């Protein structure tokens, strides 16, 4: 019996388990090869068990969330991919602090808070992905970021139970954290606690609607992973990519969006290799022409 077989037996009672699941079905890019094991969980306890079981079996594990902000290799992912659908939320006695499981839709939670007249997340209503992913990448837009309202997170510790960690200890920076720098490798976000402020629901919903309208006008609606690159200090990434002559450039069925050059889109049956080529070409051109290094915001996942 292989390590994967042993792990599959252990995971069976804790979620919906599939073998060789094509990850293109589970990413906003619509790109990605198969996962050896693919487990859908619906509670933070099941997520913690799965991550710990994979650790004990020495099988690599990846928490996928909603599949945004990632480019999964055509060869897929070896080991276990956990589809996190843990979405329970609970308010404290003040009604201002919420404990939310990491598989909750970040945008839906933000919009719900606006409707309740709670201020701090109106900027997030159009951001794809889960709350867990928002923690890992310190999601932000329109002058706000999750670090502004995040108090602490509960992490799954390999070979152990959950542990609450203060937000100040997560190394949150622009579109990154200790997770993205590899300093918390192997630790999964189980829950997050956010603290909001009293506000006016009508005003917050108006702000959210304005952000929605801006995104609709400026960003492509097709299959993509969100912003491809972080914005460097010198200039917004889209301006540099545009100036480098890449607006609308294609490779296979992958393309640089005509509407917003920092969005790379899947226009049919694009391969991860074609998207990766466009990313590398943008880095090369911008580096050679402007002396600026573009750092990907999208994460490369799997067997590259």
Show where each model-derived region lies.
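Anion-binding (especially nucleotide phosphate/pyrophosphate-binding) glycine-rich loop
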Residues: 2-131, 135
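Phosphate/pyrophosphate- and phosphate-bearing ligand-binding catalytic cores of soluble enzymes
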Residues: 18-19, 25-27, 70, 156-285, ...
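Structural signature of FAD isoalloxazine-binding scaffolds in flavoprotein oxidoreductases
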Residues: 32, 39-44, 71-89, 136-167, ...
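Short, basic and Ser/Thr-rich N-terminal targeting/leader segments
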Residues: 57, 64-66, 149, 222-223, ...
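Residues embedded in well-ordered beta-strands within globular domains across many folds
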Residues: 81, 122, 154, 298-299
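N-terminal short leaders/motifs
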Residues: 104-111, 140, 177, 183-184
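Short, well-ordered alpha-helical segments in soluble proteins
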Residues: 113, 131, 135-139, 154-157, ...
């Amino acid at each position: 019996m292989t390590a994967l077989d042993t792990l599959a037996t252990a995971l069976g009672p804790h979620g919906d388990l599939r073998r060789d699941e094509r990850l293109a079905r589970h990413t906003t890019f619509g790109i990605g090869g198969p996962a050896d094991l693919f487990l859908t969980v619906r509670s933070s306890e099941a997520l913690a068990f799965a991550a710990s079981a994979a650790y004990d079996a020495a099988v690599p594990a990846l928490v996928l969330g909603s599949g945004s902000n990632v480019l999964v290799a055509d060869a897929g992912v070896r080991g276990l991919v956990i589809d996190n659908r843990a979405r329970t939320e609970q308010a404290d006695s003040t009604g201002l602090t919420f404990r939310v499981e990491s598989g909750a839709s970040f945008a839906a939670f933000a919009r719900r808070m606006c409707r309740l007249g709670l201020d701090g997340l109106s900027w997030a209503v159009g951001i794809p992905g889960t709350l867990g992913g928002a923690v890992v990448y310190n999601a932000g837009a329109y002058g706000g970021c999750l670090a502004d309202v995040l108090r602490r997170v509960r992490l799954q510790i390999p070979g152990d139970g959950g542990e609450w960690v203060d937000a100040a200890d997560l190394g949150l920076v622009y579109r990154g954290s200790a997770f993205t720098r590899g300093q918390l490798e192997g630790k999964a976000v189980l829950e997050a606690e956010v603290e909001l402020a009293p506000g006016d629901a009508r005003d917050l919903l108006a702000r959210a609607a304005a952000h929605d309208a801006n995104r609709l006008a400026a960003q492509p609606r097709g299959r993509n992973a969100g912003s491809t690159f972080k914005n460097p200090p010198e200039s917004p990434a889209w301006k540099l990519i545009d100036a480098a002559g890449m607006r609308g450039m294609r490779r296979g069925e992958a393309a640089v969006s005509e509407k917003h050059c920092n969005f790379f889109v899947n226009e049919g049956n694009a391969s991860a290799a074609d998207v990766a080529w466009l990313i590398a070409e943008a880095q090369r051109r911008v580096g050679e022409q402007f002396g600026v290094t573009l750092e990907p915001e999208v994460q490369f996942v799997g067997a590259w």
